[in-house]
C-alpha cells in the first residue's frame, strides 16, 4: 500500500500549500485526488496476491452518520441552500475517503513511524517558509498572490490563526516524543530542531488563540508526564526546546512581534462582534433545533439574525460547536459529540 501512503502524503501537502484548500479550484483538486486514490486502492486490493483485511476505523462511523444526516437534508430539502450543502457534502465525502484509506495504508508500526516523520519534516518546511515570508513580506502570499479579501496571512494561509491551528495539529508529533523520552539519543538534535522551528513560527504568527492553545497543550502534557511519572530528564529536553524557540523569536525581533500581537487586533473580529455572532447562531439553532438549516448554510441564513451589523458578511460563527448545532441541529450535534468521544476513547 506504499502508493496509497504516498498519495495521502501528497494530498495533505497540497491541502496545506493551497491555502487550506478553501478556494473552488483547490477543493476540486482535493476531491478528485481523493476519488482517484480510492480507485487506486480498489484496483490494488482486487489484484493483490495476498489477502488484505479491510479495516473500518471507529472514527469513520460518526463521520458517516453526519454525512448521512447531511444527505437527508439535501434529499428532503431540509436545507436553506441545496447548492451549499452539496458542496460541503462533497468535501465531507473526500474526508471520509481519506480516513478510510489511511486505515488501510497505515497498519504497522513502521507505517506510522513513516507518517510521523513526514508530518515532522513537512511541518518544519512549512514553518520555515512561514518565517521567511514573515521576514520578507511584501503583502502577497508566496510573494505573488494578492489577498482578495484582506486578512493577516502567515505561511501559506491567508489567516494567521489558521496557520497557528495547523501548527497546533502537527507540533505534538515532535514535541510529545521529546517530552516523554521516546526519542533515541542520536536523534534528539534533529527531532528537537523539527520542534523548535514550528514552535517559533507559531509564536511569530502572533495568533492569540494559537498561543493560548499552545499553553493549554503544554499544561496537558505536563499533567500526563506527572501522572506517568516520566518527568525529570525528559522535562529538560522539552524545556530546552521551548527556551531555544523563545530565543529564536527574540533574535528575529520580539518587539515587532509584541506590537503586531497588540496592534492588529483592530483588523480582526471584535469581541462584541463575536458575542453578537454567537447569540445570532444560537437563535438560529433554537428556530431549527432538530435538523438545523443545512450543512454549510450559515452565511445564507444569518442576516435576519444579525444584531451588530458592520457591513461584513458572516460566513462562520468563530465557534464550531454552535455553528454545527445551527446547521445540523441536535442530530448533528450528537454526531459531533460521538466523534469527540470516539477520538478520546479509541
Regions inferred by a protein language model and the residue ranges of each:
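Transmembrane signal-anchor hairpin modules in multi-pass inner-membrane enzymes, especially those
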Residues: 1-121, 176-193, 219-243, 269, ...
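Membrane-interface alpha helices of multi-pass inner-membrane proteins
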Residues: 12-15, 194-206
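Short aromatic-rich membrane-water interface segments that cap or initiate transmembrane helices
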Residues: 21, 77-93, 149-164, 270, ...
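A membrane-periplasm/extracellular boundary helix in multi-pass inner-membrane enzymes
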Residues: 26, 109, 128-137, 144, ...
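Hydrophobic alpha-helical transmembrane segments
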Residues: 67-74, 111-146, 158, 199-205
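Membrane-interface segments at transmembrane-helix junctions in multi-pass inner-membrane proteins
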Residues: 126, 139-177, 206-209, 319-324
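TM-adjacent membrane-interface loops and short helices in multi-pass inner/ER membrane proteins
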Residues: 159, 275-314, 321-335
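Hydrophobic transmembrane alpha-helices and their immediate junctions
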Residues: 330-346
Amino acid at each position: 500500500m506504499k502508493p496509497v501512503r504516498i498519495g495521502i502524503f501528497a494530498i495533505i501537502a497540497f491541502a496545506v500549500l493551497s491555502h487550506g484548500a478553501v478556494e473552488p479550484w483547490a477543493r476540486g483538486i482535493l476531491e478528485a485526488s481523493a476519488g482517484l486514490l480510492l480507485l487506486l486502492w480498489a484496483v490494488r486490493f482486487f489484484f493483490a496476491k495476498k489477502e488484505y483485511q479491510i479495516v473500518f476505523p471507529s472514527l469513520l462511523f460518526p463521520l458517516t452518520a453526519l454525512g448521512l444526516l447531511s444527505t437527508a437534508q439535501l434529499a428532503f430539502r431540509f436545507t436553506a441552500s441545496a447548492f451549499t450543502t452539496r458542496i460541503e457534502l462533497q468535501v465531507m465525502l473526500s474526508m471520509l475517503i481519506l480516513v478510510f484509506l489511511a486505515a488501510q495504508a497505515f497498519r504497522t508500526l513502521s507505517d506510522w513511524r513513516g507518517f510521523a516523520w513526514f508530518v515532522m519534516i513537512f511541518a518544519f518546511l512549512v514553518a520555515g517558509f512561514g518565517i521567511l515570508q514573515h521576514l520578507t513580506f511584501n503583502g502577497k502570499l508566496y510573494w505573488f498572490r494578492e489577498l482578495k479579501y484582506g486578512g493577516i496571512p502567515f505561511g501559506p494561509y491567508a489567516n494567521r490563526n489558521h496557520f497557528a491551528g495547523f501548527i497546533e495539529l502537527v507540533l505534538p508529533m515532535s514535541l510529545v516524543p521529546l517530552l516523554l523520552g521516546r526519542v533515541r539519543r542520536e536523534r534528539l538534535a534533529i527531532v528537537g530542531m523539527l520542534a523548535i522551528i514550528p514552535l517559533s513560527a507559531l509564536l511569530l504568527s502572533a495568533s492569540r488563540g494559537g498561543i493560548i492553545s499552545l499553553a493549554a497543550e503544554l499544561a496537558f502534557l505536563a499533567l500526563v508526564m506527572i501522572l506517568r511519572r516520566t518527568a525529570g530528564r525528559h522535562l529538560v529536553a522539552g524545556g530546552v526546546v521551548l527556551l531555544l524557540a523563545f530565543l529564536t523569536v527574540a533574535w528575529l525581533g520580539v518587539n515587532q512581534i509584541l506590537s503586531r500581537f497588540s496592534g492588529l487586533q483592530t483588523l480582526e473580529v471584535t469581541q462584541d462582534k463575536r458575542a453578537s455572532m454567537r447569540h445570532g447562531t444560537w437563535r438560529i439553532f433554537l428556530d431549527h433545533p432538530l435538523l438545523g438549516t443545512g450543512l454549510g448554510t450559515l452565511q445564507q441564513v444569518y442576516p435576519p439574525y444579525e444584531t451588530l451589523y458592520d457591513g461584513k458578511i458572516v460566513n462562520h460563527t468563530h465557534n464550531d460547536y454552535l455553528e454545527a448545532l445551527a446547521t445540523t441541529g441536535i442530530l448533528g450535534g450528537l454526531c459531533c459529540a460521538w466523534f469527540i468521544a470516539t477520538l478520546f476513547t479509541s
